[in-house]
A protein has these predicted regions:
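Membrane-interface "cap" regions at the ends of multi-pass membrane proteins
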Residues: 1-31, 35-39, 51-56, 68, ...
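Select transmembrane alpha-helical segments in multipass membrane proteins
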Residues: 7-17, 80-94, 126-130, 185-198, ...
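Helix-loop-helix connectors at the membrane interface of multi-pass transporters/channels
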Residues: 76, 103-126, 159, 214-218, ...
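TM-loop-TM module centered on a large, flexible mid-protein loop between adjacent transmembrane helices
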Residues: 73-76, 80, 112-116, 227-289, ...
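A generic transmembrane alpha-helix motif of multi-pass inner-membrane proteins
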Residues: 165, 358-359, 385-439
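Helix-loop-helix junctions that connect adjacent transmembrane segments
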Residues: 2-5, 40-41, 115-122, 150-278, ...
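Transmembrane alpha-helical segments of multi-pass small-molecule transport proteins
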Residues: 12, 45-46, 113-144, 157-165, ...
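Hydrophobic transmembrane alpha-helices that form the core helical bundles
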Residues: 31-35, 53-131, 135-139, 144, ...
Length: 439
C-alpha cells in the first residue's frame, strides 16, 4: 500500500478539525450568554471571524516553523528565548485555569443531574474532588486517557449538533426577540461582555494544524480544512446557543447550571433532560481527563527545554508525569478555593475570563512573530502578504478580547504575566548568558 493511500483528504481533515474544536467549552455558554441576551449573536459573529483568522495563521505557523514547542517555538522567531518562555508559561497557566472551569462545568451538570443544591463551598470542594479524580486516573498513562476522551467527546457533540438540527421545531421567535437585550445594556458593551465567553469555546484552535503530516498536499489542504473546520464549528456554536434562547425563557436559562439539559427537558420531558445532563457530565469529565494529562505534558516539555523546574519532566514507567500532575492539581485546588463565588455560574465566569486573558498572550506573541517566521522560511511573497494580513486581523481580535474580558481579568492576567517575567529571570542564564558569551 502506498504512503499516499494512508493520507487523509481535505474533507476528512475538515471534519476532524471541527470535531477536535468542539469540546466541553460550550456546555455552560447558553447560561452566560442569556445574562446578556440574544444580542450575543453579534459577539459570536465577531469571534467567528477572529477565530478563523487565528486558526488560519496558526496553520501557517505549524506548516513552516522549524522550531519545536508549538506557540513557544513560533514566538521565538521574533522574541527569542524570552518570548518562547512567556508563550509556554502563559499557555500553561491558561490551561491550569481552564481545566478548573471545566471541572466546575462537570459539577454544575452533575448537581442538576442528581437534583442537588450546592453551597459555594460545596461547589469548590466537589470541583477539587473532580480534579483530583481526573488526575489519579491519569497515573496509568496516556493510552487509556486518550481512548476514554475520544469516546466521551460525543457526549457533547451529539446533543449540541442535535439541538442545532431539531431544536427549531420548539423555537419561539417572539421569545428570542424579547430576549435581545433584556437589561438594556449599551450595544457595544453588550457585545464586548460576551466576547471572552464566545472565544472560550474556540480555545484549542492553535492546534488546528496538528494533523498536517497525515494530509495529502498539506500546503493547500491544511489551510482549507482549518478554515472550513473553524467556520463549521462556529455555525454549530451559533445555531445551538441561539436556538436554545428561543426554547427556554431568558430568566430561567440565565439561572441554569445545566442549560442544554434544561433545553431538552423543555423540548421533550424531564427524563430526556436528565439523559442529556448525564451525557454532558460524562463528556465534561472525559475532556477534563484528557486535558489534565495534556497540561502535565505541556509542563514536561517546557521543563525539558529548561524553562520550568526539572521535577515536571519526571515520568513513571508508564510515561506518566505524576509529580507534575500532582503539582498542577495542587495549584488548581488553591485556585478553586480562591475563586469561591456566590454561585457556580459566577465562579465559572471568573475562571473563563482569566483563562481567556492568559491564553490570548501566546496568541499575540505568535501572531507578532509570524512575519519573521515566514521570512526566515522563504515563503512566497503573495502567501507572505496574505498570511501576515490575516495574522493582523487575528491580533486585532485578540487585543479586543483582552479589552472585553474586563478589568478584574486583566488585572489578574497582568499579575500572572509579570510573575512570568520574574520567573524567566531565574532561568534566563541558561539561554541569554550563552548568547552573550558567543558574542
Amino acid at each position: 500500500m502506498s504512503a499516499k493511500s494512508n493520507k487523509i483528504g481535505v474533507v476528512q481533515l475538515t471534519i476532524l478539525t471541527m470535531v477536535n474544536m468542539m469540546g466541553s467549552g460550550i456546555i455552560m455558554l447558553p447560561t452566560k450568554l442569556a445574562e446578556i441576551g440574544t444580542i450575543s449573536i453579534v459577539s459570536w459573529l465577531v469571534t467567528a471571524v477572529g477565530s478563523t483568522a487565528l486558526a488560519y495563521a496558526f496553520a501557517q505557523c505549524g506548516m513552516f516553523s522549524k522550531k519545536s514547542g508549538g506557540m513557544g517555538g513560533y514566538a521565538e522567531y521574533s522574541f527569542g528565548k524570552a518570548g518562547n518562555f512567556m508563550a509556554n508559561y502563559t499557555y500553561g497557566v491558561s490551561l491550569v485555569i481552564a481545566n478548573t472551569a471545566i471541572a466546575i462545568s462537570a459539577v454544575g451538570y452533575g448537581s442538576e443531574f442528581l437534583g442537588a443544591t450546592l453551597s459555594p463551598l460545596s461547589i469548590a470542594l466537589w470541583t477539587i474532588f473532580t480534579l483530583w479524580l481526573a488526575t489519579v486516573l491519569n497515573f496509568g498513562g496516556a493510552r487509556i486517557t486518550g481512548n476514554i476522551s475520544s469516546f466521551t467527546i460525543w457526549g457533547v457533540i451529539i446533543p449540541v449538533v442535535g439541538i442545532s438540527i431539531i431544536g427549531w421545531k420548539w423555537f419561539d421567535s417572539l421569545m428570542y426577540v424579547n430576549s435581545w437585550n433584556p437589561h438594556n445594556v449599551p450595544t457595544f458593551e453588550a457585545i464586548g461582555v460576551s466576547i471572552s465567553m464566545t472565544l472560550w469555546a474556540f480555545l484549542g484552535l492553535e492546534s488546528a494544524c496538528a494533523n498536517a503530516d497525515a494530509v495529502e498536499n498539506p500546503e493547500k489542504n491544511v489551510p482549507i480544512a482549518v478554515l472550513g473546520g473553524t467556520l463549521g464549528a462556529a455555525v454549530i456554536y451559533i445555531v445551538s446557543t441561539n436556538v436554545i434562547a428561543g426554547i427556554v425563557p431568558n430568566l430561567e436559562l440565565a439561572n441554569s447550571t445545566a442549560p442544554f439539559g434544561l433545553a431538552f427537558a423543555h423540548m421533550f420531558d424531564e427524563t430526556i433532560g436528565k439523559v442529556i445532563m448525564g451525557l454532558m457530565v460524562m463528556s465534561c469529565f472525559g475532556s477534563l481527563l484528557g486535558w489534565q494529562f495534556t497540561i502535565a505534558q505541556v509542563f514536561k516539555s517546557s521543563a525539558e527545554e529548561g524553562y520550568f523546574p526539572a521535577f515536571f519532566k519526571k515520568v513513571t514507567s508508564k510515561d506518566a508525569p505524576i509529580v507534575g500532575m500532582v503539582t498542577i492539581t495542587a495549584l488548581q485546588t488553591l485556585l478553586s478555593l480562591m475563586t469561591i463565588s456566590p454561585s457556580l455560574n459566577k465562579q465559572f465566569n471568573v475562571l473563563v475570563d482569566l483563562a481567556v486573558v492568559t491564553n490570548v498572550i501566546p496568541y499575540l506573541l505568535s501572531m507578532a512573530a509570524l512575519a519573521v517566521l515566514l521570512k526566515a522560511e522563504n515563503v512566497a511573497p503573495q502567501k507572505y502578504k496574505t498570511t501576515v494580513f490575516v495574522a493582523f486581523i487575528g491580533s486585532l481580535y485578540s487585543i479586543y478580547a483582552l479589552y472585553a474580558a474586563g478589568e478584574q481579568a486583566m488585572l489578574y492576567g497582568s499579575i500572572v504575566t509579570f510573575i512570568g517575567w520574574t520567573l524567566y529571570g531565574f532561568v534566563s542564564y541558561k539561554f541569554d548568558l550563552k548568547k552573550s558569551q558567543a558574542n
